[in-house]
Amino acid sequence: MMSMSFMSDTLNSSDPSKSAFLEFGHGLASNQQHLSGFAHNIYPVHGLHSGGHLQHDAPYPSSAPHYSRPLGYAYPGPVSAAAPGAYMPYQPNNHSGALAHTRAENTNHEKPAVIENGEIRLNGKGKKIRKPRTIYSSVQLQALHQRFQQTQYLALPERADLAAKLGLTQTQVKIWFQNKRSKYKKIMKHGSSGPEGELLHTSSSSPCSPGLSQLWEVSMANKVPPMHPSSYMNNYGHWYPPHHQDPVPRPQMM
């Protein structure tokens, strides 16, 4: 009876070395279970198949039965979804918007200002923008020349009236009179000593002016001296034989 009771006591009593080994094994299993769960949280899509079941490579599959449950969808979340804080969303910079607005304003300032009535315009660089040259008709030129012979300067009402009659703008009439006065002064400066200057006081030097024919006649008269017909024959007499009268009269025919 003593041997049987000793064996039962021996079986019931725990060996310290064996209990320590069992506790170490149980702790190792719990650590592996914890690590496998942590890996599952970090990589949720690892080991997924088309059936939607999650496969683990843990050495103790029975220790984590809740991981083998079938999922309702193939992926636990959208693939494109990223963890919060992975990157900062792009926000437009207010400085770049202000810079673009400033450039747009500078571009608008560089555009030339449009001025009506054909005035001279300036662009953003301060250079003059020349308009195309105005082509006047013969009727307009004739009327302008006639008015210039009457007066070289037009008042504002006279200029407006003349521009309305000819179908021109006031600026075109003003520029034409300015150019005409400039040409007139140049001709007066260079030809005031000769007869051309005297005729320019009374007539215009335009091709449409009737004074050009008189100017041409006077200039040609000064260059070619007058010549008498007798002197002309004397200069060229050697080309023609002299006319001699016959001394014997010819008989008259009956």
Curated annotation (Swiss-Prot):
It is found in: Nucleus. One of its GO terms (molecular function) is RNA polymerase II cis-regulatory region sequence-specific DNA binding. Disruption phenotype: Morpholino knockdown of the protein causes reduced cranial outgrowth and defects of the cartilaginous elements of the jaw. Gene3D superfamilies: Homeodomain-like. GO terms for cellular component: nucleus. The keyword Chaperone does not apply. It comes from the Eukaryota. Residues 129-188 bind DNA. One of its GO terms (biological process) is regulation of transcription by RNA polymerase II. The keyword DNA-binding applies. Pfam families: Homeodomain. Its main location: nucleus. Keywords: Developmental protein, DNA-binding, Homeobox, Nucleus. During larvae development, may be important for neurocranium morphogenesis. Belongs to the distal-less homeobox family. This is Homeobox protein Dlx4b. It comes from Danio rerio (Zebrafish). The gene is dlx4b.
